[in-house]
Structure formats: C-alpha cells, structure tokens
Amino acid sequence: MTTSLFPASDFTIPQLADLMTRSFEGYFVPINITESALLTMLKRDSIDLTSSRVMINNDEPAGIALIARRGWTSRLAAMGILSQARNQSLGTQTMHKLIEEAKERQDKEMILEVIEQNTAGVKLYEKVGFKKIRRLVGYKLENPQVESKEELKEIDIRELARLVTYHGLKDLPWQLSGTTIMQHTPPSRAFKLNDAYCLISNPDAKDIVIWSVLVKSRSRGAGLSKVLMMALLSKYQNKIWHVPAIFPEEMSFIF
C-alpha cells in the first residue's frame, strides 16, 4: 500500500484532534485528545504542523505523525495509525519519509520515546535506525496520607524553567527540559523548598501531574527531593498523583 503524506497544517485543529484520538484506539495506552489538549501540546512541545504529516490512503486519513522541532533537533512527538490501516507497512513507509525530510531540513538529530511494552513500535523504530538510549519511568499514587510541617513557597514558572536549564541534567528528555517548562502557565504552579523545586498541574483538580522536580547541584544527596515531595503531598491532600513516564530512570529515587 502506498501512502501519501500531507502537512498537518492543511487540516483544522478539530480534524487533527479527532484523527489523533482514533489513531490511538486499541494501543497499549489509548488517548483521548481534545482540541484544547492538542493546542496545549503544540505550544508546550514545540510541535511544527508544517513538518508534521497526515497519512492519506484512498483519499481518507489513515494516521498522523507529529514532529516537534528545536534548533537542529527534531522529535517524533506522536505517531498513530487507524486500526483498519495497521499491519500494512504504513508506519515503516512514514518513518522513512520523516527521516528523509529531517535530513533535507539539515537536522542533526531525531529523537522519540516509545512505551517498551509496545513491542511493535519498538521493532519499527529500531528497524528504521533508532537506537535505545535509556529508560524513562512514571508513577501513580492515590490519596497518600502524609503530614509535613515544611512550607512551600510559590515561584514563577519561568524562574523554575531557568533553573532547570542551568542546574538540570544536560540531557534531560524533551518534555522535562527548561524550554518545555517555560511553556507551562497557570493554573499549573511551581514551588520551592530551600534548594528543591517542582512544577505541578492545576492543584485544584482531583488528579495532579508532577511535571518537574529539581534540586540545585550544590544540595544534591541531602534528601531534599524527598522533603519536597512530602511537603507537596501534605499541602494537597486527597489527590491522585501522576508522574508521567518522561523521567529518566536515574531520577526514580525522587519518587
């Protein structure tokens, strides 16, 4: 089957959101992308719709690939194929074309993340030349009963972004980088406790996402991240906490 690729910028946001949702039906982690969620994703992750592609077969959308770009690096932010179009080499064809286009743009690097239980996805990306770099981990904690007397101080998210750029690991994943953190806005909130910092999603919601945790270089190894987490869980009781699978495994001790 031959697939034609068209710029995602040729389609409306509602069309893209609907295609994203349908393209991930039945996947290891199905997703429901609303228009608002897609717009947030585009802004926060630097997704370029002119470089992103919609797969077309028989004049009908068959899948989507979102490409994020910063400097000389591009990232496959998401790729999904409609259930009726799977197992027909669409993924392989599309990836070869996306890599070719990245070379034409003179990108120096192309990166992506894939859930390790998605064995078909892992095989696809390795087949077209990607190499495993490291493992990313995520967690979930429901209604922890924690008491802490420590006081968190709220700070501007932009300040945290600058600190992450300066003090964070030099090879942080795309979604943890200072550049990404800079794009978060209220109702997300950033806090500090001495030399420890964090960014969370709207704390008024039942489910809260921890988007960033940082301890300044000079204070690492003193257990500040645990003190910070305890203060955070104590401040917002009766919540369901989510750590998305974007944190390098070497940072797992924080959680």
Question: What annotation goes with each model-predicted range?
Answer:
Residues 1-33, 145-176:
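Short amphipathic alpha-helix that is part of the acyltransferase structural core
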Residues 29-66, 166-192:
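Active-site rim helix/loop that mediates acceptor-substrate recognition in acyltransferases
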Residues 54, 60-68, 75-80, 192-203, ...:
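Conserved beta-strand in the GNAT
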Residues 69, 82-84, 88, 116-117, ...:
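Active-site acidic-Proline motif in GNAT/NAT acetyltransferases
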Residues 81, 87-100, 123-127, 221-234:
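Conserved acetyl-CoA-binding loop-helix of GNAT-fold acetyltransferases
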Residues 88, 92, 104, 116-134, ...:
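Conserved active-site alpha-helix within GNAT-family acetyltransferase domains
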Residues 102-113, 236-247:
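Conserved GNAT acetyl-CoA-binding A-motif
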Residues 128-202:
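Amide-forming acyltransferase catalytic core, primarily the GNAT-like/NAT-type
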